C-alpha cells in the first residue's frame, strides 16, 4: 500500500500545512466516488503493481477528515504520475554501461506517486473521512510491517549462528578448503 506522504512541516498535521497536497486528501466527491490529490513518497514496487492502496501515513484528528482516505486505485488511473528514482542501496555506480534504470534484470526501484484528482469509485473506498479508523489502520500497519523491519538484523544473527553451528556439527572448521 501507498502510505508515506511527503509531509512538509512535520510539527503540523495535514490540515495545518501551507500546501494541503503534502498529504493525500479528498478534493471532491460525487455519486460515483471521490477524487484525491497529493503524493506518496518512497513507493517501492508501485511501478510493477496493478493496484495501489492509498492510506494515511500518520494519526489524524477531526480537523484532518479530508485526509482520512483509504482506497484502491488502478496503477494506471488517470491523474497518476510516477517520478521514478533509484534506491540508495542499488549497485548502478559499480556497474558498467550507460543504462540508468537500475539493474535491468533484478534491480530495486522507488517512485514518488503524484496524484492529481485521481478518481476512486465508491466500491473501492474503504475509509472516507472517518479519521478514527484511519489512525487505527496506521497503527496496525506499523505493528505488522514497520516493526518487522527492526527484527531483520536479529533474524540475520540467528540465521548466521544456525549456519555456523551446522558447519561446526559437520566438521567444516577441521576440513581443508
Q: Positions of the model-derived regions?
A:
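FAD-binding core of flavoproteins
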Residues: 1, 5-151
Amino acid at each position: 500500500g501507498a502510505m508515506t506522504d511527503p509531509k512538509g512541516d512535520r510539527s503540523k498535521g495535514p490540515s495545518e500545512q501551507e500546501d494541503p497536497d503534502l498529504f493525500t486528501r479528498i478534493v471532491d466527491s460525487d455519486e460515483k466516488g471521490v477524487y484525491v490529490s497529493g503524493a506518496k513518497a518512497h513507493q517501492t514496487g508501485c511501478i510493477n503493481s496493478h493496484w495501489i492502496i492509498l492510506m494515511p501515513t500518520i494519526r489524524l484528528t477531526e480537523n484532518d477528515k479530508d485526509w482520512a482516505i483509504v482506497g484502491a486505485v488502478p496503477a494506471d488511473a488517470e491523474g497518476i504520475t510516477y517520478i521514478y528514482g533509484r534506491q540508495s542501496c542499488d549497485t548502478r555506480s559499480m556497474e558498467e554501461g550507460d543504462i540508468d534504470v537500475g539493474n535491468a534484470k533484478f534491480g530495486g526501484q522507488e517512485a514518488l506517486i503524484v496524484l492529481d484528482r485521481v478518481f476512486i469509485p465508491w466500491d473501492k473506498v474503504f475509509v472516507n473521512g472517518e479519521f478514527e479508523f484511519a489512525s487505527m489502520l496506521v497503527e496496525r500497519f506499523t505493528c505488522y510491517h514497520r516493526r518487522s523491519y527492526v527484527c531483520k538484523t536479529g533474524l540475520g544473527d540467528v540465521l548466521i549462528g544456525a549456519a555456523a553451528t551446522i558447519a561446526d556439527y559437520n566438521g567444516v572448521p577441521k576440513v581443508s578448503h
